[in-house]
Amino acid sequence: VAETLKLVGIDPEKYFSEYIETPVYVTEELTIGKGLGEEIFNSAKLEFSGIRDDQLERIMKVSDYNKIARMFGEQEINIDSNEYAIIGDYDAVVEIRNKSLSIGHEIVLDGKTYKPAYNECVYGFISDSTQHMETGIFIVPDSAVKEEWRKFNYLNANYIGETEEEKQIVEEKIVNLSDDETINASNVGDMMALSKLTNYEASKGIGSIVIFIGLYLGVIFLIS
């Protein structure tokens, strides 16, 4: 992600006081149906009619998630080698996931079984927002993840600028990333960039603003 930003003149070392890149993984071994268990999934369908049991869950290494947790000042995750946790902040979905966790529902990744480290979801998210939108990410031991499962890469960063004008320089570049001719010509793949400067300033003033940039797997491999 950082290398792609440099293509449009956004040098992370120059514009961000702090930034971290973290991958997110998916695999057919962990779908919503498998993550919740059959009984709880069937119950969830009554409330969320659009969900499918074959929808892929998102997975993160515990070391990667804890980098984000430290940046946002949230609780870090502690799990043993045979355990997993789920982070989230979207109450309606968290409530359903808690039912699964409370009964000790186990998941299987690459032939190894993992049990819940907590009996409920840990409050958390991987991209800051004024709305609670995180429906759940499985946090697993680093060794549980295979690199071929990598699907997205996130970059979370704090602007260096102290004034609204300084931050606006980076803001304008970030929100226009998907239309940038340099990126399109480089054929690095699909990119999504979000900035919450306006909403954040309206509610909390102009402190350090956290943004995230998500890139699909194809982008990561081409620029790594």
Question: Each PLM stretch: what is its role?
Answer:
Residues 3-220:
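Basic-flanked hydrophobic alpha-helices used for secretion and membrane insertion
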